[in-house]
Amino acid sequence: MEVDFGGGYLSSDGGGLILRELERHSGLLKDFADCFIDYRDQRYIEHRVVELVSQRIHGLLLGYEDLNDHDHLRRDPLHALICGKSDPLGQDRSLERDKGKALAAHSTLNRLELSAQAIDERYHKIQAQPEKIEELLIKRGVKAIARKSAEIVLDFDATDDPLHGKQEGAYFHGFYRDYCYLPLYCFCGNIPLFAKLRDCKRDASQGTVEALQKIVPAIRQRFGRKVRIIVRGDSGFAREAIMAWCEANKVFYCFGLARNDRLAEQLESSFESLRAQIKEGTVQSPCRRFTEFEYSTLNSWTKARRVIGKAEILLQGDNPRFIVTNLPKEGWRNAAQAARFEPAALYEKFYCARGDMENRIKEQQLDLFADRTSTHWLASNQLRLWFSVVAHLIMSTLQAEVLKGTELQGASVGQIRLRLFKIAARLTLSVRRIHIELCSAYPLKGLFGLVHQRLGALRTPA
């Protein structure tokens, strides 16, 4: 057996070419790059903003979380092709030390990430525009929602993002027992619409009304005012300001409700009845019963609202749970939905489905590295979070438009990366063409061919 490094230009990310073709049809990264102002002298630059953005986000999609990774990836001509470089071998670089390295080094990408800070006369010549980025994410996210949707569910949640040291905005959170950020997310299914990085010295729901004020008009502009919008969240979002805004703007909501003594009293009779039935042997533990009633807090709410209570007896003991909603018990005109918002169905089938958003946040942090917020400044960490959100939006578009009906339609980002992008590839470059050979033993050739066919059928944006 003999081993050497004479195999030529090889890459482990051959399937990343799918991302290149998807960008050609969607133009998302180009639009995202337009959210930056480039003050550099264009006569002397070698990496355009769109190429820097593409390099960073495609790196996340292909599993490379750290800027230091790009000091090695910049030598990979396949990555250069994915990012739109016309000279994938880097032979035309102006400095001799950079020849053979088509992509930017970590220092250049670092200056891009620090663009959220004030412009420095010498080093920081690219400026991010947060308002435009936020507007773009909402616009492209809403556009990704199925066009014929009659009902749109917006899931809100906050999560912890542990810090890496004494960073800007570092505070201790009593619930998570750590120093962390507290990002706020909004998803529609697997489509990210909003992500705000915040310090943790605040209520988890803070900023939800401001997010809704941007998201809801964008949805109604595309789908019309008749579309039903339902906001869903855990008990941290059962706040007067959010519920009152929804009621004033004809938006429905369904939130968890933290238990208290007054709420517990409403379930006493249900628990007594269940215990009697267990004693008689007519039911067995675990068992549950749902109750509906009107409820208002003593001070914080301005009106009584519909509350569903779940009296549940588990082997470990009683488990009372509550939700508050303005969804109509009778449903809407469609007879098929008549019982959809009855107490049991509303809690078990609709509210509990909120838990799927936890998987989206898990994908953000584990698969797309949204928790790699290790710069000192909050603003540059927000930009890193947006990079991960844009990457997630690309993957959700791929699943909806290309992977629909395939075995990867409902797969996680990590599974899609592993099974579709991580393909050994050899590049051969000549004067006239670039030839890419993929691994002969790749087990999903049929799926890859179908993806290629569907990408070719996508309409290029005007």
Briefly describe each language-model feature range:
Residues 1-178, 182-203, 208-224, 399, ...:
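Dynamic "connector" segments at or just before major functional cores
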Residues 157, 226-237:
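Acidic/histidine-rich, metal-coordinating catalytic segments
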Residues 174-178, 183, 213, 248-263:
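Acidic, His- and aromatic-enriched active-site or binding-groove loops in soluble protein domains
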Residues 224, 243-252:
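Short, surface-exposed basic-aromatic patches at helix termini and helix-loop junctions that form
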Residues 371-441:
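Basic, amphipathic alpha-helical segments enriched in Lys/Arg and hydrophobic/aromatic residues
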